[in-house]
Regions:
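Helix-loop element at the rim of GNAT/NAT acetyltransferase active sites that forms part
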Residues: 32, 40-56
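Terminal substrate-recognition subdomain of acyl/acetyltransferases
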Residues: 1-24, 118, 122, 152-226
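A generic structural signal for beta-strand entry/edge sites
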Residues: 111-113, 148, 175-179
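Conserved acetyl-CoA-binding loop-helix of GNAT-fold acetyltransferases
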Residues: 120, 126-141, 148, 162-166
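A short beta-loop-alpha structural element at the N-terminal edge
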Residues: 25-37
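Short catalytic-loop micro-motif centered on adjacent basic/acidic residues
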Residues: 53, 148-151
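Acetyl-CoA-dependent GNAT
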Residues: 55-113, 117, 121
Length: 226
């Protein structure tokens, strides 16, 4: 029993030490089975964070409705899980006809554009999670034949403004709000391979955490019974 316990202890993925460089950020595409944890993530945002993410302080009922209405077949949602299976960051990539977004309508000849929104839990700030989510969204757009990535946020949203400036997005400010968009290069074999590898690594990481967690619970129950 001690041998099994020790093996699981070595296998378990430990919580990161302080410092963003200590934490491997794995961005995983989310699906229907993640909806409950998505709801927990958004309900965990305080009023100021909800204001920055949604442009208004949504009450719990509207946050719940937003999560319930997420369409995984139409849009793409990315997330970063910690070792306790809590979503630390979520990126929502919504696709729309270019006519639906007048601010970028003339910036592309493609039929669709993409709008990106991101939220990061307070305890996970400073780890580069928002940037990683944006980078994954950008490469996904390229591989989906979308060449214009758009963000709308409050000018006071330091996370999104930092991402916009760092990525070289064109930014227009007006009345405390900001519109930013980035022109993307076409897809290449390299971008397709990169996204596939990143998703596979994230899935392996998720599976390892899930199996380790299940085995640890099983061992704990077995110990109680013996």
């Amino acid at each position: 029993m001690n041998l099994l316990s020790n093996a699981l202890s070595r296998l378990a993925v430990r919580e990161p030490e302080e410092g963003p460089e200590k934490f491997p950020v794995r961005v995983k595409a989310l699906a229907e089975r993640d909806r409950r944890r998505l709801l927990m993530h958004f309900l965990g945002l305080n009023e100021s964070d909800r204001l920055l993410r949604f442009g208004t302080v949504l009450p719990d009922e509207l946050v719940t409705r937003y999560v319930q209405m997420l369409n995984f077949a139409r849009d793409t949602v990315f997330g970063v899980y910690d070792n306790r299976f809590k979503l630390m960051g979520v990126g929502h990539l919504a696709f729309a006809p270019r006519e639906a977004l007048p601010v970028v309508r003339d910036a592309t000849t493609k039929e669709r554009v993409a709008e990106f929104g991101v939220s990061v839990s307070a305890e996970a700030r400073g780890m580069g999670i928002g940037t990683k989510l944006f980078q994954r969204a950008a490469i996904h757009c390229r591989n989906a034949d979308v060449d214009t990535l758009y963000m709308h946020c409050l000018s006071s949203n330091r996370t999104m403004m930092h991402i916009a400036k760092k990525s070289g997005m064109a930014i227009e400010r007006s009345y405390g709000e900001a519109d930013a968009y980035l022109k993307l290069d076409p897809a290449s074999p390299g971008t397709v391979m990169r996204e596939a590898v990143e998703e596979q690594v994230a899935m392996l990481d998720y599976t390892l955490k899930a199996n380790t967690r299940a085995a640890t619970k099983w061992l704990a129950n077995l110990t109680k019974e013996s």
